[in-house]
């Protein structure tokens, strides 16, 4: 299985490199950052921290591999001041802010990119990310509420993983899912990632984490029965 997971990881990194979107870089970094926090193993904590620092340093402080177009493209995510498209986004957000100052509860649900429906008023600048779309549609009030709700979700799920879920197999699966969610939300600052079907996957992860304490005793019992059967079989042999 380790070989299988290694192959999948390599394919995912390659796919991220050729995807053409620099926001994809935020997904593994956000995931690793949360894994460092929820990991209860010093070995995993140390390995994840070193991996995070090594990868960040490679892209942010070196020019190694700039001859490769994919590495060069990924590295530009760490140097936004040199990215022309990012500078256009910054200018658009400044213009949006001037309009949003007069709309504390936004333009309305679906009106960040709903000009085709002919509403009375619509944001003239296209939102370049999911969080910007939330801000445009619900205003600063809605954005703060959105961030608060998801901050509580991440904190609650992390607490459950660290202190309530004892089964190692279940904790590993749910930690991987929650860390993926963290990566998605970091990427949501730069890209419209919460589109169908991504939102279904993300909120299924939250739901499973919250249900984890109820699933945990069932899996613990199953693992204990399997272990007992293995021991009995070993004695018979």
Language model segments and positions:
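Transmembrane alpha-helices of multi-pass inner-membrane enzymes
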Residues: 174-234
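Juxtamembrane transmembrane-helix termini
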Residues: 18, 25, 41, 152-166, ...
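Long extracytoplasmic/lumenal interhelical loops at the membrane interface
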Residues: 78-138, 161-162
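Hydrophobic transmembrane alpha-helices and their immediate junctions
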Residues: 33, 140-185, 211
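Alpha-helical transmembrane segments of multi-pass inner-membrane proteins
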Residues: 1-38, 158-159
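A membrane-periplasm/extracellular boundary helix in multi-pass inner-membrane enzymes
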Residues: 10-19, 36-80, 97-101
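Hydrophobic transmembrane alpha-helices of multi-pass, membrane-embedded glycosylation machinery
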Residues: 9-10, 25-37, 51-55, 151-153, ...
């Amino acid at each position: 299985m380790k070989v299988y997971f290694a192959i999948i990881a390599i394919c995912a990194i390659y796919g991220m490199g050729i995807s053409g979107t620099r926001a994809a870089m935020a997904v593994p970094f956000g995931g690793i950052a949360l894994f460092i926090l929820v990991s209860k193993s010093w070995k995993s904590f140390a390995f994840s921290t070193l991996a995070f620092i090594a990868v960040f340093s490679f892209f942010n402080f070196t020019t190694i591999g700039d001859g490769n177009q994919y590495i060069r493209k990924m590295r530009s995510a760490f140097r936004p001041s040199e990215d022309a498209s990012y500078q256009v986004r910054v200018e658009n957000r400044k213009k949006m802010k001037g309009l949003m100052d007069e709309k504390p509860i936004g333009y309305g649900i679906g009106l960040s990119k709903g000009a085709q429906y002919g509403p009375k008023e619509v944001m003239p600048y296209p939102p370049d990310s999911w969080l910007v779309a939330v801000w445009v549609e619900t205003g600063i009030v809605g954005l703060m509420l959105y961030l608060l709700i998801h901050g509580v979700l991440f904190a609650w799920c992390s607490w459950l993983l660290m202190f309530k879920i004892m089964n190692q197999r279940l904790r590993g699966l749910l930690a991987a899912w929650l860390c993926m969610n963290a990566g998605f939300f970091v990427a949501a600052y730069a890209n419209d990632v919460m589109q169908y079907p991504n939102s279904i996957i993300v909120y299924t992860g939250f739901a499973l984490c919250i249900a984890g304490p109820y699933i945990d005793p069932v899996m613990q019992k199953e693992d204990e029965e399997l272990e007992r059967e293995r021991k009995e079989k070993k004695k018979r042999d």
